[in-house]
Amino acid sequence: MEKLLWCLLITISFSQAFGHEDMSKQAFVFPGVSATAYVSLEAESKKPLEAFTVCLYAHADVSRSFSIFSYATKTSFNEILLFWTRGQGFSIAVGGPEILFSASEIPEVPTHICATWESATGIVELWLDGKPRVRKSLQKGYIVGTNASIILGQEQDSYGGGFDANQSLVGDIGDVNMWDFVLSPEQINAVYVGRVFSPNVLNWRALKYETHGDVFIKPQLWPLTDCCES
């Protein structure tokens, strides 16, 4: 009986550290500047990517630059990076090189962000609250690597680490979904209003994650929706 109870305690502890759950209407909250607060995510798909779409909500309260979404491999720490640079705007990196979408200031309200890229053309898209920015091109012919370390709240300057508090997010992140293809404009707008098209890399409704440091799970602050998954 004692051995059974010990095994049960280990199982409970493991399930709390490595969640795999429906995060609907919840958000990760990063309440302060830190080099130790972050969330690591485990991808459902382990294969190389010839295209991707990442969508999420972000609500930040910092006047400096910060990381929004960091996807590192052992050969490229900025394999995929979504980053806000103060006074410049949003940048999207693929395989190291990055491209900038100009903006004078970060929105003060929760913002829905979608970033897409495809290897065949190198076309990069950035959507903010269902509205597209001008398309740009980056890393045509590149293939995004496997065995990724995916981090929310920090930028990785090494695989799974190398964090800098001056690049940390202070605020909320939620509704994080990722696909291994480029969503159509109609699909991106549908995701913005609450529908989800079977994410096959990261799925907010069946998320594998681990929190580190002062990160909390709280109800989301952006509009609630009751749309069903397609």
Curated annotation (Swiss-Prot):
Q: Name one GO biological process term.
A: positive regulation of superoxide anion generation
Cofactor(s) listed:
Ca(2+)
Keywords assigned by UniProt, alphabetized: Acute phase, Calcium, Disulfide bond, Glycoprotein, Metal-binding, Secreted, Signal
Which PROSITE patterns would you find in this protein's record? PTX_1, PTX_2
Q: Which residues bind Ca(2+) 1?
A: 78, 155-157
InterPro entries recorded for this chain? Answer: ConA-like_dom_sf, Pentaxin_CS, Pentraxin-related, Pentraxin_domain
Location (main, coarse): secreted
* Post-translational modification remark: The last two cysteines are involved either in interchain disulfide bonds or in an intrachain bond.
> Record's CDD domains?
PTX
Listed SUPFAM superfamilies: Concanavalin A-like lectins/glucanases (SSF49899)
Listed disulfide bonds for this chain?
55-114, 227-228
Enumerate the glycosylated residues: 147
Query: Is Cytoplasm included in the keywords of this UniProt record?
Result: no
GO-annotated molecular function: calcium ion binding; cholesterol binding; complement component C1q complex binding; identical protein binding; low-density lipoprotein particle binding; low-density lipoprotein particle receptor binding
Q: How is the cofactor bound?
A: Binds 2 calcium ions per subunit.
Where does the record place it?
Answer: Secreted
Q: Per UniProt, where does Ca(2+) 2 bind? A: 155, 157, 167
SUBUNIT field: Homopentamer; disulfide-linked. Pentraxin (or pentaxin) have a discoid arrangement of 5 non-covalently bound subunits. Two of the five chains form a dimer linked by two interchain disulfide bonds located in the C-terminal heptapeptide and specific to rat CRP. Interacts with FCN1; may regulate monocyte activation by FCN1.
Q: Which family does it belong to?
A: Belongs to the pentraxin family.
What this chain does, per the entry, is described as: Displays several functions associated with host defense: it promotes agglutination, bacterial capsular swelling, phagocytosis and complement fixation through its calcium-dependent binding to phosphorylcholine. Can interact with DNA and histones and may scavenge nuclear material released from damaged circulating cells.
What name does this protein carry? C-reactive protein
